[in-house]
Amino acid sequence: MRLILSLPVLVVVLSMVLEGPAPAQAAGEISSTFERIPDKLKEFGNTLEDKARAAIESIKKSDIPAKTRNWFSEAFNKVKEHLKTAFS
């Protein structure tokens, strides 16, 4: 099933790559592109850092960790009780 779905996607991607850039997308000079790479990487890093911090803060503020910890504790205690009754 995956092969059937991946082949059309591969054909579309190859056709897009072989078609080349549109006239509006064509870069004038490669050197200007290389000069912008550090700025783009810094911007990407800052954006990634902000999103990661926001996600961590959201997790800290939510009650999901406490609920997960309680669920694991309860499940562990149930398994422990079953083992005690089975081997006693």
Swiss-Prot record:
Pfam families recorded: ApoC-I (PF04691)
Family listed: Belongs to the apolipoprotein C1 family.
Protein name: Apolipoprotein C-I
Alphabetized InterPro entries for the sequence: ApoC-1_sf, ApoC-I
One Gene Ontology term of the molecular function aspect: fatty acid binding
Biological role stated in the UniProt entry: Inhibitor of lipoprotein binding to the low density lipoprotein (LDL) receptor, LDL receptor-related protein, and very low density lipoprotein (VLDL) receptor. Associates with high density lipoproteins (HDL) and the triacylglycerol-rich lipoproteins in the plasma and makes up about 10% of the protein of the VLDL and 2% of that of HDL. Appears to interfere directly with fatty acid uptake and is also the major plasma inhibitor of cholesteryl ester transfer protein (CETP). Binds free fatty acids and reduces their intracellular esterification.
Organism: Lycaon pictus (African wild dog)
Matching Gene3D superfamilies: Apolipoprotein C-I (4.10.260.30)
Recorded superkingdom: Eukaryota
Cellular-component GO terms for this entry: high-density lipoprotein particle; very-low-density lipoprotein particle
N-terminal signal peptide: 1-26
Keyword list, A-Z: Lipid transport, Secreted, Signal, Transport, VLDL
Residue ranges of the TM segments: none
